[in-house]
Amino acid sequence: MKNISEFSAQLNQTFDQGEAVSMEWLFRPLLKMLAEGDPVPVEDIAAETGKPVEEVKQVLQTLPSVELDEQGRVVGYGLTLVPTPHRFEVDGKQLYAWCALDTLMFPALIGRTVHIASPCHGTGKSVRLTVEPDRVVSVEPSTAVVSIVTPDEMASVRSAFCNNVHFFSSPSAAQDWLNQHPESSVLPVEDAFELGRHLGARYEESGPTNGSCCNI
């Protein structure tokens, strides 16, 4: 099985071919705003990132996975206000994530402690975690694992990647799913957390940049 660095390198290479490229200056600020628990207006994103409103609108229109409400406000991109199986509680606010790896990756990007609850994809048994920005505090059950896929293309990050990245209560609980997805793997939660840190590193230095440019 691949090690963490190999998974990270392969996934980053695939992300570079898809919608994730457009998010390097946008993703972390957007996550922090979504973590407040309210829809995020385009104008707020522009103010936070230093980009023109029209440019932010154009980028959002190119992202097939972004979730917008009727007013055109962002309600989800990785972290979402729309219910999913992956419950993500931060500062008492009930949010959700698109996949199991998101729940482990996002605490570092938003700088907050998160309480996570998600059903085992094989048995339905609840998997519960507390994750701080720099460590996994607790996992119940301790045998929990996360499925990882490495798709060849990532035109839509949610359909190509997120929809196949689940919690399982144990490796044995994941076996039937792995038999059906032979190109996939499972990682212990601690290893999946480290993978999330590797993948999140590309966004950690992002900040306001004025004008159009290069990361889009």
UniProtKB/Swiss-Prot annotation:
One of its GO terms (biological process) is response to mercury ion. GO terms for molecular function: alkylmercury lyase activity. Its EC number is 4.99.1.2. Keywords: Lyase, Mercuric resistance, Mercury. The keyword Acyltransferase does not apply. InterPro entries: MerB, MerB_HTH_dom, MerB_lyase_sf, WH_DNA-bd_sf. It catalyses: an alkylmercury + H(+) = an alkane + Hg(2+). It holds the Pfam family HTH_15. The keyword Lyase applies. HAMAP family: MerB. Belongs to the MerB family. Cleaves the carbon-mercury bond of organomercurials such as phenylmercuric acetate. One product is Hg(2+), which is subsequently detoxified by the mercuric reductase. This is Alkylmercury lyase. It comes from Staphylococcus epidermidis (strain ATCC 12228 / FDA PCI 1200). The lineage of its organism: Bacteria, Bacillati, Bacillota, Bacilli, Bacillales. The gene is merB.
